[in-house]
């Protein structure tokens, strides 16, 4: 990439920050002198602010989120972004706890359902056994009449 700072046409290599600092250090007023910049000649609050502004021109985004890879020209938006990850993590933890609780309720429901089904099956078996006994005894009483 070619540097568009006033009076410079150098190719900027890997050391973008160092090259920008060489221009910024020369200007006591911390003004952006990048060709065609909407803020050309405006003084920034500090040299650090000017460096952050100049990254817009170079595309340098040195502050990267280690969780998702999103990158920024300054550290403060990255910090704000990381807080969103923490909020999502906290929300996810709450959801996971709720899901685990629902899983426990479901397991308890299944155990209780099986117990009830076994009770019903046992009652059905007893009714059938009693029906057979009554039928047998009733047959025996008819023959003695």
UniProtKB/Swiss-Prot annotation:
Cellular component GO terms held in the UniProt record: nucleus
Give the top-rank taxon of the lineage listed in the UniProt record for this protein.
Answer: Eukaryota
User: By its UniProt entry, which Pfam families does this protein fall under?
Assistant: zf-C2H2_15
Provide one Gene Ontology biological process annotation: positive regulation of transcription by RNA polymerase II
GO terms, molecular function = DNA-binding transcription factor activity, RNA polymerase II-specific; transcription cis-regulatory region binding; zinc ion binding
Keywords, ordered alphabetically = Metal-binding, Repeat, Zinc, Zinc-finger
PROSITE patterns in alphabetical order:
ZINC_FINGER_C2H2_1 (PS00028), ZINC_FINGER_C2H2_2 (PS50157)
Q: What is the protein name for this chain?
A: Zinc finger C2H2 protein ECU06_1150
Which intervals hold the zinc fingers (C2H2-type)? 35-57, 63-85
SUPFAM superfamilies from the entry?
beta-beta-alpha zinc fingers
Give TM regions: none
